[in-house]
Amino acid sequence: MAVGKEILTKIRSVQNTQKITKAMQMVSTSKMRKTQERMRLARPYAEKVRMVMSHLAQTNTDHGIPLLESHREIRRVGFILITSDKGLCGGLNANVLKKFLAQVQEYQNQGIEEEIVCLGSKGLMACQSIGLNVVASAVNLGDTPKMEMLLGPLTELFQRYEKHEIDRIHLVYSGFVNTMRQEPRMEVLLPIGENVIGDSAPKSPFSWEYRYEPTALAVLEYLVRRYLESVVYQALSDNMASEQAARMVAMKAATDNAGNAIKELRLVYNKSRQAAITTELSEIVAGAAAV
């Protein structure tokens, strides 16, 4: 029964793995719900910032703020690439990187250079492995990242845009659609589109006059920064929800596969045990007949 003991050892090993994947599935489910709630709570703030910024930009058309300039010749582009810090989340990072690298290749074919800010270690390692120009990064962000962790890399990229050293900035991340579906997204963060600055405030029969301190332009310049930061943070939260959903699905598949493997191993064990019993009975009968 040496073979039977080996099979039992394999069964116990697979059962232990199944317990781990089941626990990881449950943890990912909990984290995904918390991230979704964080996304929901952050949206009203981002929308209010956008509305006030839109109002100020429309009433101060000669603001001269570099971050609101819309028409530039594209010579150099920046990317904010958001990926996860950990693996075991299916093809989530691979799909984002595929979309990102296709756009980088398209720019390179046009002779346009790139500068990349990586949020998440998977994207950073991928960019470094193929020799892309990574100018800043933030990794090991945890399950509840703080905006302060992102300010350094983002500020550097935004300042380069203000100095006309970068002419466009893309935001690349995995968008959360539902538990079973996450899609790679690429959006133009800068220049800010007309759909953002356009009149989106609720219509009112009254005409309000606002006073801004110290000045309307100072408030507008401040809000533009806060708006850009809120968009990036929303994308990061979206990506984290996608990561947990993908990991939950991957761990469920692993748990189910482990269950199927255990069934197959038990079947093999029972067959080998039955064969061993049959052999022993045959030997006993043969011995009795010989006597």
From Swiss-Prot:
> Which domain of life does this protein belong to?
Bacteria
Instruction: Choose any GO biological process term that the UniProt entry carries and state it.
Output: proton motive force-driven plasma membrane ATP synthesis
The record's section on CDD domains has: F1-ATPase_gamma (cd12151)
- Assigned GO CC terms: plasma membrane; proton-transporting ATP synthase complex
User: Gene3D superfamilies, per this entry?
Assistant: 3.40.1380.10, ATP synthase, gamma subunit, helix hairpin domain (1.10.287.80)
Please name the InterPro entries in this protein's record: ATP_synth_F1_ATPase_gsu, ATP_synth_F1_gsu, ATP_synth_F1_gsu_CS
Q: What topology does the record note for this protein and the membrane?
A: Peripheral membrane protein
GO MF, any single term:
proton-transporting ATP synthase activity, rotational mechanism
Q: Does the keyword Transport apply?
A: yes
Please state where this protein is localized. Cell inner membrane
Q: How does it assemble?
A: F-type ATPases have 2 components, CF(1) - the catalytic core - and CF(0) - the membrane proton channel. CF(1) has five subunits: alpha(3), beta(3), gamma(1), delta(1), epsilon(1). CF(0) has three main subunits: a, b and c.
**Annotated family:** Belongs to the ATPase gamma chain family.
Q: Which PANTHER family match?
A: ATP SYNTHASE GAMMA CHAIN (PTHR11693), ATP SYNTHASE SUBUNIT GAMMA, MITOCHONDRIAL (PTHR11693:SF22)
Q: What is this protein called?
A: ATP synthase gamma chain
